[in-house]
């Protein structure tokens, strides 16, 4: 299984199926300019903010992908012409043809800006994706004790940029709660407002005995 970081909170996961998480492509200063997306089977959207719902509508149409998100976002996307959606909610677990997926809690917002309107985007979340390995994408979130309830996480994708999400120290505490085999930092240094030192995070995480892999946009990890 290959995990590719595409800047900000965008990840591509390739196994038997290909998953794109939080597809913020256009306008993403961290997206690698020469990167060409492969065919996408599933698009996972953690919440409705523009830097996460991103280019979902266009990409779902281009690839014929199924979008998995919360109920409200799926309804919104259907109104925008997305044909294949699968709505879930926090705590929901579903056995798909690729494996089991759970939507996890996140402490954040989820309003969708549509023109001059802000549309209710349901509850923000994360995803626990069980393939050959278990991948946890936390979404945008503050530190929460719910993370202690996660079990068997092989790879955790955690925001560290502060201001809107956990900072380095809270993300380290999240690692203590989750106890993953590997952690990859995300949602940092896209803009000055979420600047963070990934090497500081790595040093603190590895003192806990957990492997930390810092991926530059466009780089991949095989697990």
UniProtKB/Swiss-Prot annotation:
Superkingdom as given in the UniProt entry: Bacteria
Keyword Hydrolase assigned: yes
Keyword terms, alphabetized: Hydrolase
An example Gene Ontology molecular-function term: hydrolase activity
Family the entry assigns: Belongs to the UPF0173 family.
Protein name: UPF0173 metal-dependent hydrolase Tmel_0315
